Amino acid sequence: MVKDEPLSDESADVIVLADREEDDICELEHLRKLFIGGLAPYTTEENLKLFYGQWGKVVDVVVMRDAATKRSRGFGFITYTKSLMVDRAQENRPHIIDGKTVEAKRALPRPERESRETNISVKKLFVGGLKDNHDEECLREYFLQFGNVVSVKLLTDKTTGKRRGFAFVEFDDYDAVDKAILKKQHAIKYVHVDVKKSIYNLDKKEKQQPGGLANAIKPSLNQQQQQQGGGQQPPNGNMQAPSFRPPVPPQQAMGPYQQQPPPAPMSAPPPNFNYWGPPPPAMPPYYQQPPPQQMNGWGPYPPPQQNGWNAPPPPPPGAQQWHANQWGCPPPVQQVPPVGAVPPPMGHNGPPPTAPGNWNMPPPVPGAAPPSHQQQSSQQPTPQPNFGTGYQQNYGGGPSKHNNMNANRMNPYSAGPPNSYHTPQPPAYTGYNAGPLPPNGSVPPPTGAKAVGVSNGSVATGGSANSKYRR
């Protein structure tokens, strides 16, 4: 039986020195620390220390927990006494703790943990600040100390062929890149170079993702809008989309005894249909509610072609006419109510005026009763738009000046003064409910007087008549 020989003094001294060397801490903490991610919820500090103690002496172990619930946050840190122990642990990956594969990475210094570049795991390094004497062989030889080098690529200018001063070094493992990054200064052939993680391809992919997602979202948004909007889409042309226009409340009719006919059935407008102009005679109005009747043009949507600028010539007599104060809808059919019928209540805009003519229509002659609609349609079948005193519509689309020298030249589009003694042209009296034309040579009575002395059939004027009512 062979007995164990006692160790000599020299062998005992070697073991003691080896233990002391492992206990000596002469390197930075982040070079001796490992980050362990993906821990199980029930993994404790004892399990971590027992597992990673097989590759070196562990001086510190911590599992990060929530301050309120004290539950594990799924990651922790292991600190060795030497950096070579970290290399041993990384060479023996993958690591399985409590039945779960964890992710072991070299820990970064605290100021660099918030940097996006250092937190990404890549296998390629960017090396900048190279000189003309730096070639691929010297780069490969230098970076072999961190891990197995797969490729080295020096970039050159395509036109001149000169080197651009930087290169890319690729490894077979991301741990070699992290190890090279933790070394702050790199000198190759006595020249300090800049070493960073190559994240160019990652930035390119991230820039492409928002555009691709936006292009994928656009069709779905269009489908949702079509489903929510419902109905028919507006055709191409000059028509404005009716969905962007608020609904117009129905107004009261012009007269107390007028009734509104029922609206025509809905139908989509034809393509290339000008929504702002009057529709063809056979086209019903393009809205669901009854068409409102404008009073003196005061409505929520005044017509843009009210004064007839750039308007087509009037249709021949006998055709269906369109009034300027009605916005793209045909004139309503007037019906006389039976005797004894109660008139409908007035609208919210107050009582309608007696003559809803155009804006620039001269006032009617006092004392003359306005004719009915049937008499007006028989006497004046073609109403012309009023352009003010002294103007009439031209077939070219704009107003034309006649030979009346007494017209108001400073304000041609406004109505004439009530006491003007010139005879206006017939187109100026073609309003909707305008009275008959006064006889030629007649003199309008003065306004504001209650009684005027009449002598031999003529109206008495002069200073005596005016001083009678002066106060």
Swiss-Prot record:
Required for spermatogenesis. Could be required to process a specific transcript essential for spermatogenesis. Residues 259-293, 300-318, 329-369, 436-447 have a biased composition (Pro residues). This is Ribonucleoprotein RB97D. Keywords: Developmental protein, Differentiation, Repeat, RNA-binding, Spermatogenesis. The keyword DNA damage does not apply. Residues 222-238, 370-381 have a biased composition (Low complexity). It comes from the Eukaryota. InterPro entries: Nucleotide-bd_a/b_plait_sf, RBD_domain_sf, RRM_dom. One of its GO terms (molecular function) is mRNA binding. Residues 221-471 are annotated as: Disordered. Residues 32-109, 123-198 form the RRM domain. Pfam families: RRM_1. The gene is Rb97D. GO terms for biological process: cell differentiation; spermatogenesis. Residues 401-411, 455-471 have a biased composition (Polar residues).
